[in-house]
């Protein structure tokens, strides 16, 4: 596997096609692509400022999107690269959120730890910030909810 640079449009196109439950992001700090041994793009990760305002302390970044085509070890590879780049940029911590139904094996394999702090979940749709709620989307993993409303787990890595 090899890390490759991507521009925002390339990363968002990939996320738009393959992410199971999120739309592309509007902006990020950096993004990394993952190529398999044949040179095919098999995953992307996008890293930005933390969505949680309390965590946005200037020393923390968040993996806001990570999406692969199912290539083995691509997720772990991308999480590791994101942490490495964030450290080189001078950040002291990197975080990400996964659904409660996901086990976090790729994060654990990359040295990330689950935060003991309880985090929320549910719908982000509210009168002051309405979301386009799409009940279902078809993906390579079958039909899934576009915006899952289950609880989230936060994983962190101290850099």
Show where each model-derived region lies.
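Short amphipathic alpha-helix that is part of the acyltransferase structural core
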Residues: 1-25
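Acyl-donor binding region in acyl/amide transferases
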Residues: 4-5, 29, 36, 48-138
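Conserved beta-hairpin
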Residues: 15, 28-45
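Short secondary-structure junctions
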Residues: 20-24, 113-117, 142-146
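Intrinsically disordered, low-complexity regulatory regions enriched in Ser/Pro/Gly/Thr
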Residues: 26, 108, 147-148
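Short beta-strand micro-motifs in enzyme catalytic cores
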Residues: 30-32, 59, 151-155
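C-terminal "cap" of GNAT-fold acetyltransferases
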Residues: 124-159
């Amino acid at each position: 596997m090899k890390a490759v640079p991507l521009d925002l449009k390339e990363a968002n196109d990939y996320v738009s096609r393959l992410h199971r439950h999120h739309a592309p992001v509007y902006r990020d700090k950096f993004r990394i692509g993952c190529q398999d041994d044949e040179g095919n793009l098999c995953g992307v990760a996008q890293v930005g400022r933390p969505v949680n305002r309390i965590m946005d302390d200037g020393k923390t970044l968040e993996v806001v999107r990570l999406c692969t085509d199912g290539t083995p070890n691509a997720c772990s590879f991308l999480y590791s690269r994101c942490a490495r780049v964030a450290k080189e940029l001078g950040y002291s911590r990197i975080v990400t959120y996964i659904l409660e139904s996901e086990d976090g094996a790729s994060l654990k394999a990359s040295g990330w730890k689950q935060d003991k702090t309880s985090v929320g979940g549910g719908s982000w749709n509210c009168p002051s910030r309405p979301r386009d709620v799409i009940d279902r989307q078809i993906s390579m993993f079958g039909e899934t909810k576009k915006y899952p409303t289950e609880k989230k787990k936060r994983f962190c890595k101290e850099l």
